[in-house]
């Protein structure tokens, strides 16, 4: 399967749910990459995951071509955040390779 990710808030800090979804899909043999709006029109992904943390962040401005679009996060579903990740996805080690510049020689701690 072809999986695409959209970090709606931008790439200024790692998005933990997208990182965990990336790990889970890669473990299952899927191809995971950032969503590219131009190439998606001739090779649409099977699933696009969109994650948004902040309610003040504008939504993704471009049309999305995919078989399935899944939105999540407090930015979309304040205050409860919407549906939680599946347990097996939640317990995956995050895929820090999605943010090579932000995660170079850096460790992030997430608390909830």
Task: For each feature predicted by the language model, list its residue ranges.
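A short, structured N-terminal alpha-helical element that caps or precedes a catalytic domain
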Residues: 1-81
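N-terminal [4Fe-4S]-dependent radical SAM core
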Residues: 1, 74-112
């Amino acid at each position: 399967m072809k999986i695409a990710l959209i970090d709606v808030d931008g790439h200024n800090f790692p998005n933990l749910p997208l990182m965990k979804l990336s790990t889970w899909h890669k473990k299952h043999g899927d191809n995971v990459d950032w969503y590219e709006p131009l190439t998606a029109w001739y090779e649409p992904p099977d699933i696009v995951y969109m994650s948004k943390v902040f309610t003040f962040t504008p939504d993704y401005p471009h049309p999305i071509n995919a078989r399935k679009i899944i939105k999540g996060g407090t930015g979309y579903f304040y205050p409860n955040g919407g549906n939680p990740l599946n347990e097996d996805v939640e317990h995956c080690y995050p895929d820090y390779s999605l943010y090579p510049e932000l995660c170079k020689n850096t460790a992030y701690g997430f608390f909830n």
